[in-house]
Amino acid sequence: MFWYLKKNTALFIFLFSGCLFGELVDGDTLVLHPITWNTSSPEGWNAQYKKIIQFPGSDGPWAKIIMVQTLKCDSTTKGDNYPCGEWDYIWNIFVNVPKEDTVETFSMGSFVTPYGKRLWLGGEAGWEWTYDITDYAPILKEEREIIVGNNQELLDLKFLFIKGAPTRNILRVENIYPYGHHKYGDLADDIVLQETKLQLLPEARGYKLKAVVSGHGHAGPRNCCEWDSKTHTYYMNGSELFRWNVWKDCGNNPIYPQGGTWPFDRAGWCPGTKVDEYENELTPFVKPGDTISIDYEIEPYLDNGEKEGEFRISHQLFSYGSPNFMNGAEIIDIIVPSSKGAFSRFNPTLSNPKVIIKNAGAYDLERVEIHYGLKHRRKSVYHWCGHLKFLEEEKVFLPIPNWHGLRRTQTFEVEIKKTNGVKDENPLNNILTSTVPLPKIFPEEFILEIKTNNRDRARENSFTISGNNGTVYYSRGFFKDSTEYNFPIELKRGFYEFLFRDDMEDGISVHWWNRNSAPEKIGISGELKFLKWDGEVLHEFKPDFGQELKFGFIVGPIP
């Protein structure tokens, strides 16, 4: 399926003989929809979808290329007996590119599915993840085979090609070390992924290294390499260039609860997330046309069996032209307020909006004028000051806007008006909207009921109830095991946030994973709920929440 959407309209243009009827202008989005809910689930163990896709040949340049991956639980999947796959399975997004009389395979990202037992994955709408794959523009042309997903969940896949000038033109993408599975010992002993020479593209003016690394297996006393943090390093011409640690905090995973040990940190991934990507700008260290030696290394292993663990790795080099804009800032995303599943841990809320901005211009970014608020309402203005070099990003907390009118419109807008005191050169990435999820409405008086768990775990918990002005109205910690607490709460009209923490990041649920090895350590689950004075439940939380719970609510009417 192939169509495009005119900016701010719903005009469909069909593909015929490789050409589009109609001309794309900056801001238009060309949509490819090769896999839908109706596409048959692949057959075979952990089988992937394979699709031949006709990508656009010449209708660029593309300001952005976004891949939208949506998964949902469905009994028609062929992987196992559950609507969603029972275990956490890793898969890649591969694109096969013709190269002389063979093909070269590029990985555009890696993903790990969530534990599927008793999993809610967005219901019929599914759960959405987005990938910015603009850097792969040189290979997303004409006919290509895409290999993606698996048969544990149903997959819906779209590619969005947004017409316009990118931050800098992407000239070439190369595999330094193509995607592969490697034993930790082989990596550390330099048996695989040895030093290699690269000829930098002479006509390029910028270069970037990208590594996607995830640890797997349960070797040695620290269960390497899924559960063990290791240091990874790039060397150039024999000298250390970039060093990073592969480790990911999973305690605030937005997909919860899951039927597995989802809250615990892992080597570069969590169940239900994309594998972390590590990008390093090579430009300051090289000159166009240089021949360089690149070597990837990992910290030495200990003689305890851990070398049998595994890493799944790809390393790529991207070559670019000069920046297309001198003064330019981009709104990458709106974290708060947002209805996106990825940000559900922070929403709903009517506290400070939180956005991500990026310097998309060659000049250092020092000032940004940001207008924001509800659509069709008077906007607030915030003057950000800081220092971001080209391509650097920052999360910005905006002062709380006027939420009056929220009953009539839940569309929130953020717009960059000026960068460094002048008009931004690229208006295409200056405005973004989100949907404001409405918080629950509570009475002025209610009860917070907490039933603690046992095995000395209650002391890990604490809570606060605070207002939009930052004032903490209620707080408590140092709970006793196996005890019921009832806190009478009385608040005036306004917006409030309840925060409940667990220091060990394992929620207040039972430790069910001890059922075979140490059943005496399973313990009991705690309970956490808000009640009216007559006992009616206002809101009840699931005990398997990981690190913390944030819950916003309104006392009084919606503004």
Question: Model-flagged regions — what are they?
Answer:
Residues E142-R144, D290-I292, E394, R408-F412, ...:
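Exposed beta-strand face motif in extracellular beta-rich ectodomains
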Residues M1-T29:
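Bacterial Sec-dependent N-terminal signal peptides
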